[in-house]
Amino acid sequence: MLTHANWQEPNINFQVDEMYRGALEVLRWSYQEYGNEIVYACSFGIEGIVLIDLISKVKPNATIVFLDTDVHFKETYETIRRVKEKYPQLNIVMKKSALTLEQQAAQYGEELWKSDPNQCCAIRKIKPLHEALSGTKAWISGLRREQSPTRQQTNFLNRDDKFKSIKVCPLIHWTWKDVWRYVSKNNLPYNPLHDQGYPSIGCEHCTKPAFTMDDLRSGRWQGSGKTECGLHE
């Protein structure tokens, strides 16, 4: 089994087919390799919807972890409800921070997402994912190379030093058009905020409509110089 501890660049030739761009083959390999020791950390954005549908074809009872920061859009929670209805066999885990918003405010001050967004992400996303990945060997992410300059070197299989894990990224060759074409063709439920200028959706306080569709993440942490929550750095 390929793990963080024994990592070497895998000599696996995944075929980038026309229909799935390699994603389905990567998922089949991943669940065969890791079984129940792999989870999908999903934000329920549009890429996440595609991956959930693909995962359901490979492992209908797969574990999907949503990092519930308690400050997501109501549309995001409604999307999760609709996904649960469509895929009742999936094990969707709502993973929260150990600190409530009230406890966080008492310890770090009100509106930490403004005063120190990195600390806020660490408390409400990074630490909870560390906890969710405890006992697993790998996790799946919806990263695409097209999303941002920081993601252009992402491979199907990546050694993740932050979480001491293998990060599997099946959608690296998918374009924005590929994603939407798949969602439309298969009539999949998705977050309606995508139709309102939000190509990338995170917490409500830190997500605005994108400045430009040339930078799909330009609506995240606007004005802060921050482009990633820390999960993929």
Curated annotation (Swiss-Prot):
Cofactor(s) demanded: [4Fe-4S] cluster
E.C. designation(s): 1.8.4.10
GO biological process: cysteine biosynthetic process; hydrogen sulfide biosynthetic process; sulfate assimilation, phosphoadenylyl sulfate reduction by phosphoadenylyl-sulfate reductase (thioredoxin)
Free-text function comment from the UniProt entry: Catalyzes the formation of sulfite from adenosine 5'-phosphosulfate (APS) using thioredoxin as an electron donor.
Keywords: Cytoplasm, Iron, Iron-sulfur, Metal-binding, Oxidoreductase
GO annotation, cellular component aspect: cytoplasm
Record field: catalytic activity: [thioredoxin]-disulfide + sulfite + AMP + 2 H(+) = adenosine 5'-phosphosulfate + [thioredoxin]-dithiol
Gene Ontology terms for molecular function: 4 iron, 4 sulfur cluster binding; adenylyl-sulfate reductase (thioredoxin) activity; metal ion binding; phosphoadenylyl-sulfate reductase (thioredoxin) activity
Primary localization: cytoplasm
Protein name: Adenosine 5'-phosphosulfate reductase
Pfam families: PAPS_reduct
Subcellular location: Cytoplasm
Gene3D superfamilies per UniProt: HUPs (3.40.50.620)
Pathway assigned in UniProt: Sulfur metabolism; hydrogen sulfide biosynthesis; sulfite from sulfate
Cofactor-binding details, from the entry: Binds 1 [4Fe-4S] cluster per subunit.
